[in-house]
Structure formats: structure tokens, C-alpha cells
Amino acid sequence: MRKVVLITGASSGIGLALCGRLLAEDDDLHLCLACRNLSKARAVRDTLLASHPSAEVSIVQMDVSSLQSVVRGAEEVKQKFQRLDYLYLNAGILPNPQFNLKAFFCGIFSRNVIHMFTTAEGILTQNDSVTADGLQEVFETNLFGHFILIRELEPLLCHADNPSQLIWTSSRNAKKANFSLEDIQHSKGPEPYSSSKYATDLLNVALNRNFNQKGLYSSVMCPGVVMTNMTYGILPPFIWTLLLPIMWLLRFFVNALTVTPYNGAEALVWLFHQKPESLNPLTKYASATSGFGTNYVTGQKMDIDEDTAEKFYEVLLELEKRVRTTVQKSDHPS
């Protein structure tokens, strides 16, 4: 029986690279591309099938920044499949990034230059917005939409006799200082992306505590510093092109400078081959590239309090109840 792999954000960047790499290793997979843009998804499917004709590739339209779209897409997935072996929670946004050029140049000549390059801490803020669901856009897109997707797909994911895996695309930018249980959506702060990624790490721990006994395991990874549409929103592409030689040189000291989506997907592919029971839920697995261009995976212990993770999970469940009620009322106005 073909293994079924569902990937959100599969039409570009790391998600697209992941699709190609998985099929290159096992073209007997059934990939399901969960994408917002159907035309782009169809183009990706055609390209993948042209190079891997024995594979199966299907498409589900899904916008993780819309609860209605997630629920509708999940229903379509449940009609197509009886189980999911892997769910890659990869879609995400970094909207309206504000780059602090002064802090960047100061950082280059400081002892924190490596930390700055790998986390963007201190040089990057974002202007968030509110979705039609009344939630902060970064929070809903990067975390809550995926949480609802997991909840909707539980019947396909929870099989104690044959474990399924959740694999989240997180970030080194995930910082405890940018997250608060009193403001889980980071509506009052300047770094919603960092907050959403730390929330991802928390949820990963809570999901393992609550679902391992049901045969569902969760892991988080960091792709490193990758050139994608997301990073092109921070600086123009030509600036990144000028920075490439510096980044290649720095790889001898900073293995997080993976640069290409192919390299950035290394940990995603590595996790695909691991027995989920053997993985540490408190470890973030990071894609790394050596100065000589060799890809490998490193493990980093996360700064996570398990009780906080459980409290966050409970807050998400309460938010789910509230938001579902609101959406149902909008679907059926009196």
C-alpha cells in the first residue's frame, strides 16, 4: 500500500523542494499537495509527475489562514484517503517585514554576528493584520490553521498499530521572550513570526504528550537560512545575490546557512526516514550545510517548559470552540 504524505505550502520554496526530494527517494508515494493557489498546485503536480511518472500526486485547495478553507479541505482529504502516514505542516508567512539596517550593520561587527545571521533576532520585525476569522494573520497561518487541520484529520492520523507523523517547519527565530500565554496571538508585539514559531514548538510537545498513545507523533525542524519568497520580502533578490559569497564563506563557521530550498529540506527528509518513537519531542531537528556543501541534520534542545506547553494546548482548545462557533454563525446567518 502506498504511503500517503500531505504537505501544506507545497507549491513553492521548501515545500516544493520537499516534494521533489521525497519522490526522488520513493516514487511509490502518494503526495497530496495542500495549496491555496490551484493553478500553481496543478503546475507543480504536472512537473512532479513528468519526472516521477509512477508516483501519485493529488491536490487539495486549502488556505490555512481561513478556518472555513481548512475544514473544507480536510473534508476533501477524508474523502480521498483512509489514513495519512505523514502530515507536513509547512505553510507559513512572514508579512510586511521591517528590516533594521542600522542594527544589521552594527551586528556584523559584533560578537553576536553568527546569532544574528541564524535567527534575525534584533533586526527584523513585522506588521501583522487580522483575518476574516478575527485572528491575527501570522498566528492563524503559521499555527492555528494547522492545529485545526490536525483536529479535523485525527481519524486519519491516529492508528496505534501503525504510527503517523506530524512534521512542523519551525525556526531558530522561535524565542521564548516573544511568546506569552496572555497574548498567544502576539497582537500587542512586534515579532509575531517569532511568537508563532515558539508556539509551534510548544504545541509539538503538547501533541506528543496527548497523542503518542494513540499512534500519532510530532516533530519540529528548522530549515536554516534559505532563499525563498519569504526572505525576498526582507531584502530584494539582488541584495541576497550580493550576499551569497559571504554566506558561502560563513558556512565554514555557521552551518545554518543552507541557502537553497533543497538544502533547507534536509531535516524534513531525514525525519521522513526516522521511527517517530525514537525521536525526542524536546529536540528541534535542523537542516545544516557544511562549508564544503555537505548536507546533514543537527539536534537542538528546545527551551520549552512542558507545563506551559500543556496550558497552551488547553488555551488552543478553548479558542477552537470559540472560533468554530463564530464561523458556524457566519455560515448560517439568521
Swiss-Prot record:
Residues on Cytoplasmic side: 251-334
Location in the cell: Endoplasmic reticulum membrane
One Pfam entry name: adh_short
Segments in the Extracellular topological domain: 1-229
Transmembrane segments: 230-250
Membrane topology: Single-pass membrane protein
E.C. code: 1.1.1.270, 1.1.1.210, 1.1.1.62
Glycosylated sites: 37, 127, 178, 229
EC top class, as a word: oxidoreductase
Glycoprotein keyword on record: yes
Reaction(s) this enzyme catalyzes, per UniProt: 17beta-estradiol + NADP(+) = estrone + NADPH + H(+); a 3beta-hydroxysteroid + NADP(+) = a 3-oxosteroid + NADPH + H(+); 3-dehydro-4alpha-methylzymosterol + NADPH + H(+) = 4alpha-methylzymosterol + NADP(+); zymosterone + NADPH + H(+) = zymosterol + NADP(+)
Residues the record lists as binding NAD(+): 8-15
Posttranslational mods: Phosphorylated.
Presence of keyword Lipid metabolism: yes
Phenotype of gene-disrupted mutants: Death at embryonic day 10.5. Embryonic lethality is caused by severe brain malformation and heart defect.
GO molecular function: 3-beta-hydroxysteroid 3-dehydrogenase (NADP+) activity; 5-alpha-androstane-3-beta,17-beta-diol dehydrogenase (NADP+) activity; estradiol 17-beta-dehydrogenase [NAD(P)+] activity
Gene Ontology BP terms: androgen metabolic process; brain development; cell differentiation; cholesterol biosynthetic process; embryonic organ development; embryonic skeletal system development; estrogen biosynthetic process; nervous system development
Tissue expression summary: Most abundant in ovaries of pregnant animals. Present also in nonpregnant animals in ovaries, mammary gland liver, kidney and testis.
Pathway(s) this gene product operates in, as recorded in its UniProt entry: Steroid biosynthesis; estrogen biosynthesis; Steroid biosynthesis; zymosterol biosynthesis; zymosterol from lanosterol: step 5/6
Key words of the record: Endoplasmic reticulum, Glycoprotein, Lipid biosynthesis, Lipid metabolism, Membrane, NAD, NADP, Oxidoreductase, Steroid biosynthesis, Transmembrane, Transmembrane helix
Described function: Bifunctional enzyme involved in steroid-hormone metabolism and cholesterol biosynthesis. Catalyzes the NADP(H)-dependent reduction of estrogens and androgens and regulates the biological potency of these steroids. Converts estrone (E1)to a more potent estrogen, 17beta-estradiol (E2). Converts moderately dihydrotestosterone (DHT) to their inactive forms 5a-androstane-3beta,17b-diol and 5alpha-androstane-3alpha,17beta-diol. Does not metabolize progesterone. Additionally, participates in the post-squalene cholesterol biosynthesis, as a 3-ketosteroid reductase.
Family listed: Belongs to the short-chain dehydrogenases/reductases (SDR) family. ERG27 subfamily.
Assembly, per entry: Binds to the short form of prolactin receptor.
Protein name: 3-keto-steroid reductase/17-beta-hydroxysteroid dehydrogenase 7
Lineage, top ranks: Eukaryota, Metazoa, Chordata, Craniata, Vertebrata
Protein encoded by which gene: Hsd17b7
